[in-house]
Amino acid sequence: MSWRALLYRRPSEPQAIEVFFERAVYLVRLRRHRQARRYTLRIDAASREVVLTMPPRGSVREARDFAQKHGGWIAARFKRLPEAAPFAHGIEVPLRGVAHRIVHRRGERGTVWTETDERGNRRLCVAGEPPHVDRRIADFLKREARRDLEAASRSYAGRLGVKITRISVRDQSSRWGSCSNSGVLSFSWRLILAPSFVLDYLAAHEVAHLVELNHSPRFWRLVTRLYPDARRAKVWLDRHGTDLHRYGLPERRGGADEV
């Protein structure tokens, strides 16, 4: 939580409240904002979290009444989210845009590897004990993402003659990539789930920011010069980007429990 949020939060104020609708209970995170003039609700599609923004002088009682009044809205939005796909045996996960079925092979050596059967079906195999399957798959995907993103970013940087200070790969929920004025590039590891042309476009986009830290026409010309098929990648992200956030989530829908 940021220091600004702590500044506006009252000492005894809860960080979240519960909203009941039909047979489900939803956990709603409270967030005060100094510029808020009214109570607002939103669903974070990436984290599957319900967030209620409050005015500085708003009360928890009013926030609870507001959220409960909109319980049907919350439930409807959750139903529209794609089903969670945990990293577990039998689940299909895309790797560079190609579906791979997770296969747990408890007795085998190694950690995670890919293979293709005689019918051309792709598998993402993981060894070890069942409790470690989720973490091992996640670690593997993050390593693959870093490898691809570093290779693509450094290739584009070489073409422009610019220097990357550092490359960070993490689970960013709000942006697929970013570039700081100090030359640090940050990316979401989930780009490894998308087709390779999407990852390549994001790498070109952020490297272009090392020259033009804006979204001016000159910036977009630079992106097109580095990656001529940028529009195709942008369209893919607009259509399918939200879906990438469902992988690796627990089977229970975020924020909702049956009562």
Residue ranges and their predicted role:
Residues 1-201, 210-259:
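Active-site-proximal or metal-binding-adjacent scaffold patches in catalytic folds
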Residues 206:
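Walker B catalytic acidic pair
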